[in-house]
Amino acid sequence: MSGVQIPVTVKLTPFHASLPAFVHRLEQVGVRGVTVFNRFYEPTVDLDALEVRRTLTPSTAADLPLRLHALAVLSTSSELSLGCSGGVHSGEDVARAILCGAHVVQVASALMEHGPAHLAKLRSGLLHWLDGKGYATSAEARGVLNLERAPDPTAWTRMNYIRTLEGWRDRSSWRTRP
């Protein structure tokens, strides 16, 4: 990339065995930023018509947690600019991405649904949240909940999944068994 004169950002997929290792290799070749995560065009199958249907499924806030996890991990191991794409629909979603380490968010589905004026709502929602928490800038909040700085970093790890399942198992004993 020595001949490239503009900053290059790579939009990643979540399908890497070791996302931090892959991002490190990108950093070594001169990439300046990464965005988590690219969404794929995913046609579906219509069982009645027996045909493949084109669909465009907008993102929802349910898409955000996967990206937050990646940001929380990458922001501890990379100096690259980190972007978040997918699942950002409110100022609070922007704040979540920043807390996990994002420098930028990309918004499409929310704008398709609400129009360009929605950008002002995202901005005002973020500013309101920052002010309410005592942050003067988004830079002050960036990475506060990443893997190294979160009050309980294990919440980002697989061990938390195991603890969650154990809690579910404990609750399942409340049920009457036949």
Model-derived segments and their meaning:
Residues H128-W168:
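Charged C-terminal helix
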Residues S85-G86, H114:
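Small/polar loops that bind or transfer phosphate-bearing groups
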